[in-house]
């Protein structure tokens, strides 16, 4: 079962590891498969009972079809929110449940509920990022959350031991990780691997090697004795399903390199800095900035601004590529925009729906966003325009994403089957955004006065 899941997850894991090496803040995903195997190894016994191979196949088929279909439909209906949650990663969880049911029986799959709950919570990075942001967003905070996840895995992996020993192993894992987390968090990936991977594994091994005074449960038997006989055809079907998932490429990875621009592009574009938002450091790290620049006014056109998120790590910027930083009455999604002479490659459009506004005091908006590199910084530039044609309402300011409100609210919105609407945007609004984007892009592409600009 573990081999089947690893093959299905191999392509995604390769991209996750590459992102972690590049500086991604979701580096804990590198050790998550190890923690999952550690927990699964703790299920060495299963309860007595009569198995039914045909029922196992039926249940596995229903879970697989319904689970994968639900993931596919949610990704199609709300692509941006699904991409932020990396909802496609849950496909491996669904497949793992199906494999366990077919290979070991439905009864054993039910006893592994704690493993499924663990993976459902941490296979997607949003809960981890939200917890890290709540603590402050520093590398130490991220390492603390990762070490806590590893400690939870230790507790779940020692289920057959006495509660006192389980708690002791969990405490030892946390205590052993603490000095490393506090002193070595600047080496983020190695710290995560050791604190959330190596130390939990050693803690479980140590707990199991210690003599156990707990008596065996007479209602349980070794899993090898309870494992039903499966034919070569069964293994072949599972292998085919695994190959299909592996070929599907669960991880969406954009390898396009951002264009390089002069570091003084804001000054040369006539943009004036008017505000900065410190909350971004909780999500993108202490070296990141989010700055709003005022755009030159144009008579008869809506108000506009330029927001620039800067960070030294391209991987961190990729972690947040699907975050919506502006308020909206309904779920909104990024859409690709065809590159042209005035629109940078990779530009995406995002806007609120004025027809679906739930708060009359709110300001609807239209935004074009793209990624670029200025010197040693990677930047996400967003040209945001107010949909108020009078020009007296500034576009809304960026807000910290609320994972619970945005996600639960979006799922509730979807359950109510609200119509998507026509997504009408006044031509003046889109024209204002396109014109400002073209002006900024043209200045960025031109050489600096006195010589060509540096390209790192």
Segments predicted by a language model, with ranges:
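Alpha-helical transmembrane segments
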Residues: 1-11, 58-69
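Short, hydrophobic transmembrane alpha-helix segments
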Residues: 12-25, 43-50
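Alpha-helical transmembrane segments of multi-pass membrane proteins
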Residues: 1-17, 245-250
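A cross-kingdom signal targeting lumenal/periplasmic-facing segments of multi-pass membrane
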Residues: 298-455
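Internal/C-terminal transmembrane anchor helices
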Residues: 219-253
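Membrane-interface helix caps and helix-loop-helix hairpins in membrane proteins
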Residues: 17-22, 73-85, 102-108, 128-138, ...
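Loop-to-helix transition at the N-terminal end of transmembrane alpha-helices
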Residues: 19-37
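Membrane-embedded alpha-helical segments of integral membrane proteins
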Residues: 134-217
């Amino acid at each position: 079962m573990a081999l089947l899941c690893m093959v299905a997850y191999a392509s995604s894991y390769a991209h996750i590891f590459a992102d972690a090496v590049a500086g991604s803040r979701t580096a804990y995903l590198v050790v998550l498969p190890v923690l999952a195997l550690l927990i699964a190894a703790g299920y060495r016994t299963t309860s007595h009972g009569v198995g039914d191979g045909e029922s196992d196949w039926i249940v596995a088929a229903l879970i697989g079809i319904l689970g994968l279909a639900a993931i596919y439909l949610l990704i199609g209906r709300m692509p941006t929110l699904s991409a932020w949650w990396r909802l496609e990663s849950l496909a491996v969880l669904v497949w793992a449940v199906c494999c366990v049911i077919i290979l070991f029986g439905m009864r054993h799959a039910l006893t592994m509920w704690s493993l499924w709950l663990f993976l459902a919570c941490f296979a997607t990075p949003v809960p981890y990022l939200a917890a890290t942001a709540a603590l402050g967003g520093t590398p130490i905070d991220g390492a603390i959350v990762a070490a806590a996840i590893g400690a939870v895995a230790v507790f779940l992996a020692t289920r057959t031991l006495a509660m006192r020993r389980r708690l002791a192993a969990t405490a030892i894992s946390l205590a052993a990780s603490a000095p490393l987390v506090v002193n070595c968090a600047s080496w983020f990936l190695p710290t995560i691997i050791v604190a959330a991977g190596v130390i939990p594994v050693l803690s479980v091994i140590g707990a199991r090697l210690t003599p156990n005074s707990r008596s065996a449960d007479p209602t349980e038997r070794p899993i090898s004795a309870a494992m039903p006989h499966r034919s070569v055809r069964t293994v072949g079907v599972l292998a085919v399903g695994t190959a299909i998932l592996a070929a599907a490429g669960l991880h969406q990875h954009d390898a396009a390199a951002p264009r390089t621009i002069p570091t003084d592009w804001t000054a040369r574009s006539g943009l004036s800095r008017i505000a900065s938002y410190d909350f971004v450091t909780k999500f993108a790290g202490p070296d990141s900035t989010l700055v709003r620049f005022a755009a030159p006014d144009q008579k008869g056109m809506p108000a506009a601004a330029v927001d620039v998120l800067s960070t030294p790590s391209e991987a961190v910027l990729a972690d947040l590529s699907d975050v919506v930083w502006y308020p909206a009455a309904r779920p909104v999604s990024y859409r690709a925009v065809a590159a042209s002479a005035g629109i940078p490659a990779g530009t995406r459009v995002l806007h609120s729906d004025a027809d679906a506004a739930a708060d009359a005091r709110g300001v609807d908006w239209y935004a074009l966003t793209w990624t670029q590199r200025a010197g040693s910084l990677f930047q996400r530039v967003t040209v945001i325009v107010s949909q108020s044609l009078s020009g007296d309402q500034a576009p809304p300011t960026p807000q910290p994403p609320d994972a619970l409100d945005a996600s639960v609210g979006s799922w509730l919105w979807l359950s109510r089957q609200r119509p998507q609407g026509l997504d009408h945007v006044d031509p003046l609004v889109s024209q204002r955004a396109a014109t400002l984007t073209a002006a900024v892009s043209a200045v960025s592409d031109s050489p600096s006065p006195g010589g060509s600009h540096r390209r790192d």
